[in-house]
């Protein structure tokens, strides 16, 4: 390790203490079941309402939210598995494009997002 005046290329220094991810953002916990026959992996920044249609949960709770896990990580749901996950609200301009094409704009268009999910056979849509 280098002294305090120089940093060796590739070196990093870690501060003391814990890092709280998504500090100050609203969080909620939901139960999710994998009703499919294959494992499903969901990345840290995926708009949760748009995840694989074989995951069963209250899709309305997933609108405008993502997994509350460190950036670059993922949660894995094995077939038949049910587990609780914590979601946190999306930041930025709260617009989502692509993924499963349920949103393609503002996450505030909740009725339209749920209508598309229902039409496409997503589980967990009332």
From Swiss-Prot:
Pathway: Nitrogen metabolism; urea degradation; CO(2) and NH(3) from urea (urease route): step 1/1. Keywords: Cytoplasm, Hydrolase. GO terms for cellular component: urease complex. It is an enzyme of class 3 (hydrolase). It catalyses: urea + 2 H2O + H(+) = hydrogencarbonate + 2 NH4(+). Its EC number is 3.5.1.5. One of its GO terms (biological process) is urea catabolic process. One of its GO terms (molecular function) is urease activity. SUPFAM superfamilies: Urease, beta-subunit. It is found in: Cytoplasm. It comes from the Bacteria. Belongs to the urease beta subunit family. PANTHER family: UREASE. Heterotrimer of UreA (gamma), UreB (beta) and UreC (alpha) subunits. Three heterotrimers associate to form the active enzyme. NCBIfam families: PRK13203.1, urease_beta. This is Urease subunit beta. The gene is ureB.
């Amino acid at each position: 390790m280098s002294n305090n005046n120089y940093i060796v290329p590739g070196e990093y220094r870690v501060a003391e203490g814990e890092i709280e991810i998504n500090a100050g953002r609203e969080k909620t916990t939901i139960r999710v079941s994998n009703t499919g026959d294959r494992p499903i992996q969901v990345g840290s920044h995926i708009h949760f309402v748009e995840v694989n249609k074989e995951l069963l949960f209250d899709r309305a709770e997933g609108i405008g939210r993502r997994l509350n896990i460190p950036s670059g990580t993922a949660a894995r749901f094995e077939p038949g598995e049910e587990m609780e996950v914590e979601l946190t609200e999306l930041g930025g301009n709260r617009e989502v494009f692509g993924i499963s094409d349920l949103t393609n704009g503002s996450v505030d268009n909740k009725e339209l997002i749920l209508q598309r999910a229902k039409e496409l056979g997503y589980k967990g849509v009332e």
